[in-house]
Amino acid sequence: MSIAKDNEWNEHDSDHIARTKYNPMEHAMDVEFHNGSVYRYHGVPPIEYTRFLASPSQGYYHADNIKSNYATKRIK
């Protein structure tokens, strides 16, 4: 699976994650959860976002590979 268009929201069929977007210039991944909160993860390389998109469970992939490995800030 290739990376979706830069800085456009990608909808997900996940119990927790509603949608994500990725900025390859800043290596920033935004994650919006179904509860409306949005977090920005910094330093996420493009290959990591590609793996996230290709994962059979984006929720598990986020929990195991993104959440605890990259600096984050709540933006909404």
Please report, for each region that a protein language model flagged, where it lies by residue:
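Acidic/histidine-enriched, beta-strand-rich ligand/metal-binding domains
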Residues: M1-K76
